Amino acid sequence: AVQMVHEYLIYENLLNHLIDIGGEIIVSGSNNEKPWAVGIQNPLSQSDDASVIIKNNNNFLAIASSGEYRNYKSNRNGEKITHTINPNTLESIKNNILSVTVVHETSATYADAYSTAFNAMGSELAMDTANNNDIALMLIIQSDNKINIIYSDKWYDLVK
């Protein structure tokens, strides 16, 4: 949906815009001649404070995040049951990823698909896949009761 709204705005020659539909975001052009700024929330925070700020450079960026930190239930054993299913086990994913964010240069559809796939893969395979395919990826992971933010190589090129 966000991609279609963007394409319509471009068709109408409305080049400067930020669109957010359900956490899928497109920024295009500028915000009164300044970069658009999009904050990525800390998944463990109850506030809306951002952990990372993404700014565009008067260009198009599609941003999609995926995570299991809000939309889950617990079973009788206290284990998380999430809405993302591991395609290999056909069970709810179980990994150390709290949040996945993908920034794509051309497509919100790709950003959304990659963020969901990386969430299901787990952190090591996701980061290897992103680096091998030149994809801008940020993972917020929890390990040993610590929160770490890790980035793919492309993230540093695209998100400055």
Task: Give the ranges of each region predicted by the language model.
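Mature catalytic core of soluble alpha/beta enzymes
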Residues: 1-160
